């Protein structure tokens, strides 16, 4: 909204690369080269994939300032050993293990999506991770973040269905599914 009003900031950070593409396409961004950035050095310092996240029509407008994995499934090895659980290698094995953990009287997942006015970005992280693993890998993911692959595409729908399978199964989540949006993301791991 700020950019659309003509009040473009000198510097902007976005959590998703698709926003860079959108802002550049609308003419809101200045190419890094025009800012005096040594593009050869920049491309030397970062992987081609990370550089590519800020490229629109062959022009570099920005790049990744961080790479975070936030949708990793963490577990307690000692607890698994004590209960005889094996680390799952596939989605189906993870669901079978989740069912076993529920049968044993526990909740296998703890999610926290509350983040004040920014709630929702955590689900996006999970969705992105599932997209990378279930679609056509990086190709479908890249098309999705640039809006070439629509949310109505079967690849995206499949990822959403898989995410829903773990987030919307009441007994899978500590506090039930309603607790997902009321648990602050920084406290989500507390039950572990």
Question: What do these predicted ranges mean?
Answer:
Residues 1-20, 186:
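Early extracytoplasmic/lumenal segment of secretory-pathway proteins
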Residues 15-71, 95, 101, 122:
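Hinge/lid segment of periplasmic solute-binding proteins
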Residues 16-19, 28, 76, 90-97, ...:
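Stable alpha-helical elements in mature extracytoplasmic
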Residues 30-46, 86, 113, 132-158:
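Short, solvent-exposed loop/beta-turn-alpha elements that line the ligand-binding surface or hinge
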Residues 56-65, 71, 95-149:
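Extracytoplasmic/periplasmic solute-binding protein
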Residues 78-88:
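Aromatic-glycine-rich donor-binding/catalytic loop that engages nucleotide-sugar donors
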Residues 98, 145-185:
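Glycine-centered hinge/linker elements that transmit conformational signals in sensory
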């Amino acid at each position: 909204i700020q950019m659309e009003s003509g009040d473009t900031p000198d510097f902007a950070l976005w959590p998703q690369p698709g926003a860079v593409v959108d802002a550049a396409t609308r003419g809101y961004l200045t190419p890094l080269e025009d800012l005096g950035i040594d593009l050869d050095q920049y491309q030397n310092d970062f992987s081609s994939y990370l550089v590519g996240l800020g490229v629109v029509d062959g022009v570099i407008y920005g790049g990744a300032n961080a790479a975070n994995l936030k949708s990793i499934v963490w577990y307690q090895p000692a607890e698994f050993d004590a209960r005889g659980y094996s680390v799952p290698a596939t989605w189906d094995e993870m669901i079978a293990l989740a069912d076993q953990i529920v049968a044993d009287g526990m909740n296998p997942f703890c999610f926290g999506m509350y983040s004040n006015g920014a709630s929702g970005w955590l689900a996006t992280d999970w969705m992105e991770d599932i997209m990378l693993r279930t679609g056509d890998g990086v190709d479908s993911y890249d098309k999705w973040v640039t809006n070439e692959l629509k949310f109505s595409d079967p690849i995206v729908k499949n990822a959403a269905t898989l995410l829903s399978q773990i987030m919307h199964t009441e007994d899978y989540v500590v506090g039930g599914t309603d607790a997902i949006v009321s648990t602050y993301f920084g406290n989500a791991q507390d039950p572990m």
